[in-house]
């Protein structure tokens, strides 16, 4: 697969990625007995949300990407730099550490830069949502990258509702399922560490399906985080996957997250890059 296919993979991946207090009640008592406070047992999704990774920044300098698009694949080194609620930069450096492709996610938009061909695509989240038929926001993409449970376009508190059901996936994990809007969600949670192991997002009707798996969890300081992430997206038009190896992660340190200047690049469209 030629390196100019990398930008097509990166473009489709941008479409994919864009996409608790204790509850207490009082029991009635008879006579003069004092009222007892009963704490409602937390669901596994509540406990998982409380234990989910939380950090202000992350730097992955030795990331390894295995990319596949329309049955063609390529491997590339790269980096990931993120400042929470501000920006995430994914850089691909397939040749001698030279950056050829870049994906920038900010609350305002998504920027895909093909440095090899000196062109770029700038997309709003509304455009991305229309492309994948799923409501995507920056917060959703950020939560996916932070290995958190995501209900597209909504708060995680939706997972506290009775509509979210839990069942044993195997002896070591539990599956939490919920349907919101036109999307079916399934999350597999480790029973011991409460880490998110897999998330499936399936659009009803003719929509696509995205799956994100997280594995190789290690403790980096006080942050439990996966060292391997695999993202797949499949629909009638796209078949794309990306495996990311993250052997060296630094949390809550300084991050170089300066945006690229695209004034000397040619603006193009996502369809041009994908064709």
Please give the residue ranges for each predicted region.
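Extended beta-sheet lipid-handling architectures
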Residues: 58-62, 75-77, 91, 105-107, ...
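C-terminal motif of bacterial Sec signal peptides marking the signal peptidase cleavage site
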Residues: 16-19
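Flexible, processing/modification-adjacent segments and terminal tails
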Residues: 116-184, 264
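Bacterial N-terminal signal peptides that target proteins for export
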Residues: 1-9
């Amino acid at each position: 697969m030629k390196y100019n296919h990398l930008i097509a993979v990166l473009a489709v991946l941008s479409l994919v990625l864009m996409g608790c207090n204790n509850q207490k009640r009082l029991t009635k008592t008879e006579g003069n007995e004092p009222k007892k406070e009963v704490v409602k047992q937390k669901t596994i999704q509540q406990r998982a949300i409380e234990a989910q990774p939380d950090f202000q920044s992350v730097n992955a300098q030795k990331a390894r990407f295995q990319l596949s698009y329309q049955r063609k694949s390529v491997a590339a080194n790269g980096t990931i730099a993120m400042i929470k609620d501000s920006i995430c930069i994914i850089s691909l450096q397939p040749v001698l550490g030279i950056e050829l492709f870049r994906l920038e996610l900010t609350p305002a938009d998504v920027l895909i830069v093909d440095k090899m061909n000196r062109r770029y695509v700038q997309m709003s989240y509304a455009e991305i949502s229309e492309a994948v038929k799923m409501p995507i926001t920056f917060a959703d993409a950020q939560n996916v990258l932070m290995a958190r449970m995501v209900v597209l376009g909504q708060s995680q508190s939706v997972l506290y509702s009775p509509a979210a059901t839990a069942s044993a996936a195997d002896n070591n994990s539990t599956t939490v399922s919920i349907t919101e809007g036109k999307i079916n969600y399934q999350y597999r949670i480790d029973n011991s560490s409460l880490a998110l192991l897999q998330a499936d997002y399936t659009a009803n009707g003719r929509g696509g399906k995205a799956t994100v798996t997280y594995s190789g969890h290690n403790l980096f300081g006080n942050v439990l985080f996966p060292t391997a992430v695999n993202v797949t997206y499949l629909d009638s038009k796209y078949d794309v996957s990306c495996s990311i190896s993250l052997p060296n992660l630094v949390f809550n340190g300084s991050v170089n997250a300066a945006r690229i200047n695209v004034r000397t690049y040619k603006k193009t469209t996502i369809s041009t890059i994908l064709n």
